[in-house]
Amino acid sequence: MFDSLAGELSPHDFAEFALPPLQHIVTSVRARLWENHLPAVPLILFAKGANAPVSLSAAGATGYDVLGLDWCVVPEDVRAAAPNRALQGNLDPNRLYGGREAIENGVRQMCATFRAGNAPPKGWIANLGHGITPGVDPDDLRWFFQCVHKYSARGVVP
């Protein structure tokens, strides 16, 4: 579930207006899969900008398996608010315009940040903190993936 406007709501309004439909979606998808004898699949919630502690805690309680993080949230805060959820993100997508050094430095920092707090490697999916914008050079995106492989490998110290 990709909600790019979640951060436009106050934490109270996010809980009142956004969470009920988000919970309905996750519950309905799981029910449909079960009714049709289909295997459960991991469901991801990306609520861009919903970074207040109360919003993070509420998002963690929705039932989604993975929480996607934008680049403005501190992963440790999400880990504390939703300790039983895997995390995805959260490199600033604008780094892809900064050249190879900026991309590599950002990925190295992202990997180090997600390793803080003893988060298990399987509990994090390296990704951007939002979508890829149209002007990104495919070679820079390829470099992002290469850096992710380099710095997220087990045993590599960023």
Where is each model-derived feature located?
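Active-site loop segments of alpha/beta catalytic cores
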Residues: 1-158
